[in-house]
Amino acid sequence: MDIISTTFDQINTHIKFTNQKKIEFQNHIEKEWEIITQLESNEQFTVYMSKKLKGPNFTNNRFGLCTVKKIKSQYFNENEILNHIKLRDNKYVLKYYGCGKDNNQDVYIYLEFIEYSIPISKVKLIPNDSSIDNFNNVSNTIIELVTCKLVESLNCIHKDNKIVHGNIKGENILLVNDESEYGFSVKFINFSLNIGYEDSIHLDMFNLGCVLIQMLGCDCTKDENIDFLFSKIPNHLVEKFKKVISQLLSKNINNQILTDIISNKITTSLPKYSTLIGEPNDGLIYIGIQNNSDGLILPLFNQPICKKTFTYGVYYLSLSSFHRQLNVGVIPESIHTLELASFNQTILPGVIPTSVRTLKLPSYNKTLTQGSIPKGVRTLLLSSFNQPLTTDIIPKTVTILKLQSFNQPIEWGALPCSLVELSLASYKQPLQWGVIPYYISTLELPLASAPFSEGSIPSGVSKLIQQGEIQQINKPIKINNENNQNYMSCSQNEFDSKLTLILNSKITRESLFFGLKYLELSTFNQSFETLPIPETVEYLKLPMYNQPLTPKLLPSGIKFLILPSFNHPIRGESIPPSVIHLVFNKLFSVIESIPSSVKYLDLGDEYYVYPGHLLHSVLSFRSGLKFRVTDPIPYSQSLTNLNLYNFNIELLKNGISSNVTSLTLGSNFTNIESLSNLPSSVTNLSFGITTLNEKAISDITKYVKSTVTTITVNNEQIRKKIN
């Protein structure tokens, strides 16, 4: 039995909890969330890593991620949320964003998502017996660092928030990888509920002592005798840490202990790395890690590393002082997060294992070659790096790249298109089109950077950071096309959040990126045979394009096709059967084939359409045709939306299909009387007249049928005036 849980059951015999704050639940709408992965699950609740897709995004995570805890209604205890509210401003717990309920009354708690963290239960430092003398100072320093963090954070929760955790064990304390002085901070999770503050504060301190012993590799689960626990305190610890742990385990523990520990200035007595113990005696230090351990933090370690130094199974490795040469194969392939704060030796291809996903090299400033950074790395920190970058040095798996000291010209393609967050805090070179990848959403540049040229900042950027100040960008950068430049617009997800890039030269195959969905080329008039449009494109607008279309030239999944200048015969399957929105503003050539998928058709001012020529599938038709009184109005049997913006003459009886519900006529409509010929199906009518006065309104009142519920004249809705 776990002594921590057992002791909790023995001590916690009184329950006191009072809180008068009202809980406000929002509606939890499932379709507004995407579940990325399940983190934990039991009979009472399930915890997910989730992403907010729609509605207000209350997270501060760069990807919109947060932790969502779903609690079944029958197991919900409001004290859990009240605790979160009370701890809302405490930096040692997960940030609380809010709570919600679904239609089944299940409760959802929205919390901060920590990308890089390790439970303390998986962090153990166990030196081999043969090297324990050489390892003493390293071990003591690590214990000192972690102890100070734990004592400080727990004291803050007790003193500032008057809350007891009540469930302290290694699994409920996270070491969070961050950019603080020592590279980590502490977060407490999974607070127990219904715990009285005064009755149970000593329980937290006792359990903290057990956690410290367990972190040293000693077993606290087989004996509940406190004297036995004292015997578990490692002999090689310095006396002051033995005293700290002894105080925490004492039967006479009280609220003053944490204050006494902090007042003894343990946290301020930490030696700096430069003054810590030097290198051990000759020979290598072998650090054994338990099979179920993930993390290893060695702030003083600076010994040569061989293949036996670190055993396979280490997930997180932090060597703050290490600055020796690394050889291929000495870093275990199990490493996912690697931090080498002082390292500045040349990295040869293969030195960093392909398992690494987060790589932090804040002091590195040597030349990088292809393969120095392995494929698979997603977060790359090179704070001091200021060497030339060429194509393929930064792998295309990297999504977060921090180059705070970098100030070299960036060639096109040197930054991978996978990036979503980029820091160039010292960059003062001119930014050319296409240098900043198009999926970037967060960009950091110096305040005194070179002036931005058109298209140098992708319109997908939503956060621009300069000198630490964040500028929110809500709209795409306005395009100035006076010089007839080509520009390309694209979007990763939706058409209305497009990214805009300027192309100052001829468009090439390399200009069109994989994953492109929105594509607009303002002056493009080349053959698609020389420049295939990516199959991912769904929206294609080519204002100047006037080349013949043949089958299979256009992407098979395209939905919106806008060709305002196109004037060639349309035959066979030249228009893909996926198109639903089709625009030809200048077309007057033969239309032999339009796919039945088309719902919106715009044929501009030139094309003459005879009755029956429109497809039965067309629901919306727009044309600027200038009509004579004898000209029949084109329609299809299914047409519901008809826009004839140049129609300014008499409406003949039966001239408008009885299926049309929305009708737009010309801006100078002259025959108000003929409006009486509108079919009863029309409910929405728009047109323009020379003068809108009381007489005109009276005439419209006289001739427009009461079935028309919305009338807009000269862009002014007048239905209410008529009524």
Swiss-Prot record:
<dbReference type="GO" id="GO:0004672">
    <property type="term" value="F:protein kinase activity"/>
</dbReference>
<feature type="repeat" description="FNIP 5">
    <location>
        <begin position="566"/>
        <end position="606"/>
    </location>
</feature>
<feature type="domain" description="Protein kinase">
    <location>
        <begin position="33"/>
        <end position="276"/>
    </location>
</feature>
<protein>
    <recommendedName>
        <fullName>Probable inactive serine/threonine-protein kinase fnkD</fullName>
    </recommendedName>
</protein>
<feature type="repeat" description="FNIP 2">
    <location>
        <begin position="343"/>
        <end position="384"/>
    </location>
</feature>
<dbReference type="Pfam" id="PF05725">
    <property type="entry name" value="FNIP"/>
</dbReference>
<dbReference type="GO" id="GO:0005524">
    <property type="term" value="F:ATP binding"/>
</dbReference>
<dbReference type="InterPro" id="IPR000719">
    <property type="entry name" value="Prot_kinase_dom"/>
</dbReference>
<feature type="repeat" description="FNIP 1">
    <location>
        <begin position="301"/>
        <end position="342"/>
    </location>
</feature>
<dbReference type="InterPro" id="IPR011009">
    <property type="entry name" value="Kinase-like_dom_sf"/>
</dbReference>
<feature type="repeat" description="FNIP 3">
    <location>
        <begin position="385"/>
        <end position="426"/>
    </location>
</feature>
<comment type="similarity">
    <text>Belongs to the protein kinase superfamily. STE Ser/Thr protein kinase family.</text>
</comment>
<feature type="repeat" description="FNIP 6">
    <location>
        <begin position="647"/>
        <end position="690"/>
    </location>
</feature>
<feature type="repeat" description="FNIP 4">
    <location>
        <begin position="524"/>
        <end position="565"/>
    </location>
</feature>
<keyword id="KW-0677">Repeat</keyword>
<dbReference type="InterPro" id="IPR008615">
    <property type="entry name" value="FNIP"/>
</dbReference>
<dbReference type="InterPro" id="IPR051251">
    <property type="entry name" value="STK_FNIP-Repeat"/>
</dbReference>
